[in-house]
C-alpha cells in the first residue's frame, strides 16, 4: 500500500516523496513569522475605485402560511433557512410523530414580496412545501437567491457584470448579506463604480475558499413588477444532509434578473442618503476580484527584532495581501494580539483566516492549551475557515502522532462547544502523513500538509509546482474521502544550495510561478516577508534559509 502511494509522486523524477530531505525545517521557536525590516513592499496601483452607498431599512420577512389541513401519517415542522428566509414545510418521516406544543403559535405575518425561499435541510427525508400566491402592486427590487456547487479550491462568484465602451461611472444595486448574531439577512445596497476605461467589469463579487465540494447560496438582485406570483409548491426528497433547496415563485409576472446597467452614459457618483448610512470602500485593480490560483499567505504580527507589530501596521500589510489577490491569511498562534489585530484587518479587507494553535517544545500541550480558550473567547467564527492545531509537532519531536491526535480532538471539541462549525486539522510534512495517516486521519476534517519543494535536492525551482502537485496526489490516498490543503509552500530567496534546489531571488520567482500555476488554488504561500529575527532561534539551519522566505513581492 505504501509503495503504491510512493510510486505516484515518483513518476516525475523518481523521488517525489523520497527521503528525510522532505522533512520541513521548522523547530522549536520557529512558529513565528515576522516582517523583515529591509523587505521593501511595492505599493499597488488601483485603476478603479468603489463608493458604496448603504441604505439601511427593515429587512423583508418572507414566511409561508402553515397549511390548515392535517394528515395523520405526517408531522409538520418549521425549517429555518440558514441563509435568507424561514419556510414552513410538511415532512413525511418514519419516525414517531412529534408531540404538538400546547401553546398556540403566534399568527404568521402576511407575505408581502415573492422572494425565493431558501432552506438548508439538516436531515434526510421527504419534505412538502405548500403552494402560495402573492399579489404585488408596486415595482420593487428584492433579494433573490442563487445556488451553485463549488469544488474544493478558491472561487469568485456572484456580483453584477456590465460592459462599458468608454470610461464612465455607473450606479447600480447589488445584493449582499449582513450577519446579525446567528441570523444572516440579504439586503440590497447601491454602489457607484468608476470604470477607468472600456471593458467588462464585475461589481461586488464574492471570493471564497471551500476545502471540500460545497453548495453555496448567494443573493442576487431581482426586479419585481406588479402582478400575481405563484409558488406552485412541491415535494422534494433530501438524500444528503445540508442540502439546499430554492423554492421560486413562477407564473404571472416572473421577477426579472439583475437590472441592466448603463453601458456608455455616465451616472451620478453620489446618491442623496443620510450621511450616517453612507460608507466608502476602494476596489482592487482587478474588477473581477481575487485570482482563483492564490488561496492564502502566511502572516504573523512580529517586527524584525521579534517585538509585536502595531495594529496599524498589521492593517496595512494585511491590506497588501488582499491587494495581491489572496483570499486567506494563515496565522500560527494567539500571541501579540494576533486574533484581535489580524482578525480586525481581515474583517476590514474581506479576507478569511486560517487560525493556528502553536505547540512549543519547552511547554508542550499544557502550554498550548490556553490558546483554545483564547480562540473560543474571541469567537469571530464568521472570519474563520480552518483551525490548525499544531504545526509540525511530530516532525519537531515534540510529541508522538498518537499524542498529537488526542490534542487535536481536544481542540476540536472545545471549538465546537463554543459554536464553531468549520474544519479542524494539523500541519505536518508529507513523510509524517505517510507514516502516521492511520493515527491522524480520524481526528482531522481535511489533511493539512506543509509541502516545501526546496528540501528535496532532486528538484529545481522550475519543477517546484510539479513536485508539490504529485505530493498532493499521494496525500489524497492517505485519508480516504478527505481533501488535502497545502498549508505552507514557497522557495527561499537566499541561502545555500540543496542539490538541484538553489535559493535566490530569480529562483524564487521561477518556483513561485510554478507553484501558483500547479497548486495555487489549494496552497498557502510561505511567507509574507523575510524573518530576520529567526537568527535568535534557528539552531539547525543547514542551508541558511530560515530567514529568507519572504515572497509577497513575487505576486
Swiss-Prot record:
The keyword Secreted applies. Pathway: Glycan metabolism; cellulose degradation. It comes from the Eukaryota. Residues 1-18 form the signal peptide. Belongs to the glycosyl hydrolase 17 family. GO terms for cellular component: cell surface; extracellular region; fungal-type cell wall. Transmembrane segments: none annotated. Residues 263-288 have a biased composition (Low complexity). Beta-glucosidases are one of a number of cellulolytic enzymes involved in the degradation of cellulosic biomass. Catalyzes the last step releasing glucose from the inhibitory cellobiose. Gene3D superfamilies: Glycosidases. It is an enzyme of class 3 (hydrolase). Its EC number is 3.2.1.21. Keywords: Carbohydrate metabolism, Cell wall, Cellulose degradation, Glycosidase, Hydrolase, Polysaccharide degradation, Secreted, Signal. This is Probable beta-glucosidase btgE. The keyword Ribosomal protein does not apply. One of its GO terms (biological process) is cellulose catabolic process. Disulfide bonds: none annotated. One of its GO terms (molecular function) is glucan endo-1,3-beta-D-glucosidase activity. It is found in: Secreted, Cell wall. It comes from Emericella nidulans (strain FGSC A4 / ATCC 38163 / CBS 112.46 / NRRL 194 / M139).
